[in-house]
Amino acid sequence: MNVEQQANAEQIALWNGAAGQGWVDAQESLDRVLEPFQHRIVEAVAARRPQSVLDVGCGTGSTTLAVSRLLAKRSTAVGVDISEPMIALARARAEREKAPPRFICADAQTHAFEPASFDMIVSRFGTMFFDDSVRAFKNLRRAAAKGAGLAVIVWRSAAENPFMTTAERAAAPFLPDMPARRPDEPGQFAFADRGRVYAILEKSGWSDIDIRPLDVECTLPLAELTTYLSKVGPASRAIQGLDERFHARVIETVRAAFDPFVHGTEVRFVAACWTVSARND
């Protein structure tokens, strides 16, 4: 096992298995849900007009593609992610672009990027999964040119994001062995603590650190909710392989738990996040 495989081994296995395939299957729904954050990242890039941008944890490539369209042929956009299924879809989507970005299947925590090769590093919910965040952001800073900007969006706490944990809470009585989330482990809410995020960036050498709360209403067509619940999140993975009737019962219970978020033909919820910016001096 090489150094890159040793680091983040659990996350690499997760995102190259059920989690990664689930995001591939739900790509269109997820892109719609997360579109407001993609716009934020694109706005940040537009304000700086960089020549080269790295999108960390790019997933199926939506944000990287949007940045690439903005920059057109005069600049370069690169997406990196540990998930082979998601990178494969990102590359397939890129083939349809006039000025396609480049996608790398690698762990941004350890990958040997060309030093000082990017003058902006961005991420839409892709930086909370490192098993050594200081090491990861040091590695990203090595890839950043002098004066390069960092612009990432991360989730705040689970308590502030009830939509994101409703499925787990509703499914828990049926799935007693479903692992509980821990706030200090790699995962969706790993950067909920503002002070921890600040300390990670400071220790990894970034400067001019700014962390601000961001609350955004997100929407999903009601018709897509059941598919979304079946493909995304810990509960979706926990119910895989269950007896068909039991599986249907769990999904029915979980779906009913989302009724408070249903408004007509839409599902709406407020996403509580941090916008994080910094600079490589």
List each language-model region with its residue ranges:
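Conserved hydrophobic residues forming the short capping helix/wall of the S-adenosyl-L-methionine
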Residues: 71, 94, 171, 258, ...
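Conserved catalytic/acceptor-binding region of the Class I
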Residues: 134-135, 141-142, 146-220, 236
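Class I SAM-dependent methyltransferase SAM/SAH-binding core
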Residues: 52-111, 135
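Conserved Class I S-adenosyl-L-methionine
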Residues: 2-4, 14, 19, 26, ...
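Conserved alpha-helix/loop element of class I SAM-dependent methyltransferases that forms part
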Residues: 32-51, 66
